[in-house]
């Protein structure tokens, strides 16, 4: 039944698009063609639909597709693509997938082994990273622009440096920093680097909640914010202080 309704919906949407094209052709040079973005932040495929957290942040420009499961307080940032079409993607709690990261899976590869991508809890995946059919365990850190390939395992608390290439089947042990292309052992992680893996996850969980709230605001709430900012610019802070009004408590009727 669901497939039937989906098919009917597709027909109706395509009919509307066809009518719009006919109307534009009749208007000739006076027609205005508005390009509507077909981007879908959440998209099911092969009868698989992403499972999203109740508390977390999925950026509106991200793409979460297919068999993807994301844990509580995790965040997927702007421009990131999680494509669980030919296999599954599993992401734990309080993990952050930063801007423009690509996460994919494998149905087939050189080893002939189908492989999902599994990411644990409190993992940081830096901007522009690529994770393909690999495993990244709890509290690991993947630097910006790094690539982790099929069958590779980044153990708990390990760190992959920015721009590194972790080749297929490689294991990055706990407490080690790997860098280079191909990635190799550089040294043991410092106490500061180990602390960073924890604070990064906590910070992104907090910031993600702020972004989620801002992106969920209604038109009326946005207009209220604009009016409040305008009043704050126009009214002297000393005036408010004499009235005993704190700026954060100023109420503006829109």
Regions picked out by a protein language model, each given a short descriptive name:
Residues 124:
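Short proline/glycine- and basic residue-enriched helix-capping loop/turn segments at helix->loop/beta transitions
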Residues 53-92, 96-97, 101-107:
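A positional/architectural concept
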Residues 20, 24-47, 85, 93, ...:
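Glycine-rich hexapeptide-repeat left-handed beta-helix
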Residues 1-73, 245-248, 252:
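Extended, small-residue-rich solenoid/repeat segments and analogous flexible loops
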Residues 146, 253-254:
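Eukaryotic intrinsically disordered, low-complexity regions enriched in proline/serine/threonine/glycine
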